[in-house]
Design a protein with these regions (language model features):
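A generic structural-conservation signal
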Residues: 29, 192, 212-213
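GST-like domain detector, emphasizing the conserved glutathione-binding G-site
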Residues: 1-132
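Residue-level recognition of oxygen-bearing side chains
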Residues: 72, 195, 208
Length: 217
């Protein structure tokens, strides 16, 4: 099978790039920036008519599979290319799969929009264009889902676990951490949630994440 991932690490494409790197897959990284019209070419729009990265193509025995949406791409990679035996980030059973789906949908619904606002107005945008009031309002809203995350991590820690839905790093952790990392520029917010901060550091310090961030350089 040939797996191709379109996108750049400095985008939501980091999610499937990280997943593929975590699994040690040989894949083609098609560098596609969201700037400069690269996602608006006829060739790219044939892959993803939304004109967004990431998109992936997977040549399988059943035919070519095309997936877009970053969480869908990450979950697909884990299921299609993971061992499914508890030895990697893929789900080992239906319980883990259900939890991974739950966390992926949850983080997109409850955190991503406000996390992106924090990232943009605390770090990514030119300083003259940042609006502290927007960042502060987003941080206030984020305290609600962060309390949920902190509570789950507390329950897992009581069992001697360091991750969300199994006693190992899974695609569920990858999905949530890939959004949580956008909050790190927030001054002081993460100090209110020490278990979440420690878990996030464990996830982002993984060699596969560090390697994925360097792809295309």
């Amino acid at each position: 099978m040939t797996l191709r991932i379109h996108g750049i690490p400095a985008s939501r494409a980091i999610r499937p790039l990280w997943a593929a790197t975590e699994l040690g897959l040989a894949f083609d990284h098609v560098i596609t920036d969201y700037k400069g019209g690269h996602t608006r070419t006829p060739e790219f729009l044939a892959l993803n008519p939304n004109g967004h990265i990431p998109a992936l193509e997977d040549d399988t025995p059943a035919g070519k599979v095309v997936v877009w949406e970053s969480m869908a791409c990450s979950l697909y990679i884990a299921k299609a290319h993971g061992k499914g035996d508890g030895s990697d980030l893929s789900c080992a059973n239906l319980k883990e799969e259900g939890e991974a789906l739950r966390w992926a949908f949850w983080v997109m619904t409850e955190m991503e929009k406000d996390a992106l606002t924090v990232l943009m107005h605390r770090m990514a945008m030119p300083e003259a264009e940042r609006k502290a009031d927007l960042a502060e309002a987003a941080e206030g809203r984020l305290r609600v889902p962060l309390r949920v995350l902190e509570g789950v991590l507390s329950s897992e820690a009581a069992l001697g676990h360091e991750y969300l839905c199994a006693n190992r790093f899974t695609v569920a952790d990858l999905c949530v951490a890939s959004v949580g990392m956008w909050i790190r520029p927030s001054s002081g917010l993460m100090t209110e949630f020490p278990l979440t901060a420690a878990w996030l550091k464990r996830c982002l310090d993984r060699p596969a994440h560090q390697a994925a961030r360097k792809l295309g350089r």
